[in-house]
Amino acid sequence: MQKIRKGDKVVMLAGKDKGRTGEVVQVMPKEDRAVVRGVNVVKRHQRQTQTQEAGIINKEASVHLSNVAIVDKDGKPTRVGFKVVDGKKVRVAKRSGEVIDG
């Protein structure tokens, strides 16, 4: 089970976007990376194809999972733990003890 999943609201802990929050768009568990909406935006030069025109586009690049943390209810970053509730393994915020997904 992953600690950070698609749709989670996360905050950046390090890098040029430190402190910014965003929603996880994609998680790549084999590479330990995630794509976060509005964070780590880079410019890519795109070649013209039949469907798309050439130009410079802004695209979100992936960030390492160690540089993101889930945002708790009070808006501060929290670590994630696991607990068994009613025979199901659920994610729990270490800061508040609340179940993240349920």
Swiss-Prot record:
Protein keywords: Ribonucleoprotein, Ribosomal protein, RNA-binding, rRNA-binding
Superkingdom assignment: Bacteria
GO biological process, one term: translation
Keyword Cytoplasm: no
GO cellular component, as recorded: ribonucleoprotein complex; ribosome
Alphabetized CDD domains for the sequence: KOW_RPL26 (cd06089)
Function: One of two assembly initiator proteins, it binds directly to the 5'-end of the 23S rRNA, where it nucleates assembly of the 50S subunit.
Similarity comment text for this entry: Belongs to the universal ribosomal protein uL24 family.
Entry protein name: Large ribosomal subunit protein uL24
Name of the gene this protein is made from: rplX
